Swiss-Prot record:
Superkingdom to which the source organism belongs: Eukaryota
Gene from which this protein is expressed: rps4
CC terms in the record's Gene Ontology section: chloroplast; small ribosomal subunit
Family, per entry: Belongs to the universal ribosomal protein uS4 family.
Ranges where the record places region Disordered: 17-36
Protein name: Small ribosomal subunit protein uS4c
PANTHER family linked: 30S 40S RIBOSOMAL PROTEIN, SMALL RIBOSOMAL SUBUNIT PROTEIN US4M
Localization annotation: Plastid, Chloroplast
Domain S4 RNA-binding stretches: 89-150
Annotated GO biological process: ribosomal small subunit biogenesis; translation
Amino acid sequence: MSRYRGPRLKKIRRLGALPGLTRKTPKSGSNLKKKFHSGKKEQYRIRLQEKQKLRFHYGLTERQLLRYVHIAGKAKRSTGQVLLQLLEMRLDNILFRLGMASTIPGARQLVNHRHILVNGRIVDIPSFRCKPRDIITTKDNQRSKRLIQNSIASSDPGKLPKHLTIDTLQYKGLVKKILDRKWVGLKINELLVVEY
């Protein structure tokens, strides 16, 4: 399957708040929710919804998610925790978490249009895996800085996770360490995704 480009509000109505996909949040207690979610939920449906949450939040294709699950399965630690760490260390997600982009699709666009440097080199692959001590900056031109400046001004500095730091004056972010489970920006049961 390809990347989802359709109506975002339909997805957040069905799956709940997905901060990486859109800033909007679903209305609580809507009639649509009662219509769709009547009756007992089956185990398959619960697992599928958790997987879809992960896919739509991080903007992954089905094949990319399967590849990440396969890599996480080879690790000696908890598969679910390794999966979340792999997804959180993607360049597009780190830009979103730093506040340099309002959504993950917006961060993907910044990376694809070559506005972002990692350790002084242009990176145009959104799935680039960042490592601790990586420095993420923008190009020196005014257009790149203006795009980042608008996003940083509208972001909440209190939501910055502990594994990242940002210098808002120089438009520079630093990955300090690999993230802990409690700082993941999405409420999800990753074990259900692995079981699916």
